[in-house]
Structures are given as C-alpha cells and as structure tokens.
C-alpha cells in the first residue's frame, strides 16, 4: 500500500512539475516582450518567474525521491543521475535525467545572473526551451498516464501554446544594439595660430 502511494506521488509530482515548467517558460516569454516594459515592471512579476522555476526544481526533486522509494520500477540512484543507464525504459528515463540537469543549470545560472556576463546567462537561459522539449518527451515515453484523455488534451494544449509563444518571441525579438564609436571632431584652428599636430 505504501509502495503504491509512492507510485501515485511520483506520477503526480512529475505531471505537476511539467505543468509548472510550462507556466514558468510562458511567463518568462511574456516578461521578455513589450507587454511589461522594464522601467515600469513591478518587481513581483520577475519574482513570480523565479518562484515558478524554484517550484519546478522542488517538484522534480520530489518526483525523483518518489521514484527511488517506489518498488514498481527497478530504478536506482545512479539511474536518476546518469542518463540512459536505467534498466527500465533507458531512453525515456535518460531524457528526463538530461532535462533535470539542464533545469538545474538554468536555475543556478539564474541565481548567479548578476555575476555572469549577460550573453552567457542569456545563452544558458535559452536551454529552458530544450528542457521543456525533453520533459515533454520524457512524460510521453515514460509516463504511465499517457493514455489518459485528460493528460493527452492537457499535453497537446501546453505544447501548442508554448510552441506558439516561442515562435512569436523569436519573430518579435529586439535586435541587439551595437555601440557605434563616436567621431571626435576638433574645432578649427584660429587664424594666426599653429597646430602642432598638422
């Protein structure tokens, strides 16, 4: 009975983690558009994005703990840390492991955002899109709820909305402005004076 409880917890935490990750990515895309200008944007909007990311990490951790505690699948500690070595559905589990490490990398660099060059932070942050794709594949290939109608409908809606948001963001992104060197103009020399540089 206890083992069955762990299995239900593993399934529920995995699905909710994926949904919260979806919400975090969508909210991040909204913040990067002109809907909320940075100068007028309340601090809680960015805090909500960070909170969703942290909540996703917590739910993934709960998902992993429940998987390890459950006896339904022969998955051990190494299997949830090293990709594609699990004896049970190695590809599906491996995709989830890669998504987990990618998610942790994004979260750690976000916490250290002020200490990193913006270009590096932004490049790592783009991994979030790949994390969503890997998490989706993991849920479809490894999830035992993939046959449920509610799961299928929710999954299709989440994927379509996220895909549309990503395409919209890429199509309306603001080009990076490059600094243009200023041309220094020297005042003309007065009549009767000599310029040593000439």
Each model region followed by its residue ranges:
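Membrane-embedded alpha-helical bundles that constitute the cytochrome b-like, heme-associated redox core
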Residues: 1-198
């Amino acid at each position: 009975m206890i083992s069955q409880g762990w299995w239900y917890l593993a399934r529920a935490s995995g699905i909710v983690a994926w949904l919260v990750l979806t919400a975090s990515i969508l909210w991040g895309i909204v913040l990067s558009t002109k809907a909320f200008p940075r100068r007028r944007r309340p601090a809680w909007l960015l805090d909500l994005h960070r909170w969703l990311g942290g909540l996703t990490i917590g739910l993934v951790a709960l998902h992993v703990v429940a998987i390890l505690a459950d006896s339904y699948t022969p998955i051990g500690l190494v299997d949830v840390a090293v990709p594609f070595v699990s004896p049970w559905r190695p590809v599906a589990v491996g995709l989830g492991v890669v998504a987990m490490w990618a998610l942790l990398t994004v979260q750690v660099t976000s916490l250290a955002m002020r200490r990193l060059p913006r270009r590096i932070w932004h490049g790592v942050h783009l991994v979030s899109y790949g994390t969503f794709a890997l998490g989706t594949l993991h849920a479809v290939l490894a999830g035992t709820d993939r046959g449920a109608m509610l799961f299928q409908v929710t999954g299709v809606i989440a994927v379509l909305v996220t895909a549309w948001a990503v395409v919209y963001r890429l199509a309306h992104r603001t080009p990076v402005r490059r600094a243009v060197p200023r041309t220094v103009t020297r005042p003309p020399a007065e009549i009767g004076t000599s310029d040593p540089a000439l």
